[in-house]
């Protein structure tokens, strides 16, 4: 080990935590940056657990910045990570009983909050909204198809449970979330 030329301490706080301390709030999700996003989500939904709003607010930021940097939803690599982030946010929206496309609308609120700091976010706003809306529509179609296949399997087997093999097929072949199959 060698001494640093300028000794310092890294608290590992991150920008959101520093903002929370500076704004006198106890949670990163109570800072001004998240407040408007969370309020926008609440305006589109029924009352629900705070964790749903926080996940959606966090995931719209991640999704928008990934798309801004050239990533699009895909079945592999970075695109797969983006797809999973978007779909996880959508599932939290469904838990809040939001039934129509909503996630892409949050890009507008995000660009109001962060567009000055990140001008590229403003420049690509319409593109980001389009990509997210397309993924929302694709996921809605996936869910509809999965529910149809699931119902057909229940009708065919006349059982209360489906096989693990069929559940995996729904997930692997059709992209139907395993947790929704379990429900």
Cite the ranges covered by each PLM segment:
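A glycine- and charged-residue-rich anion-binding loop/surface
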Residues: 1-183
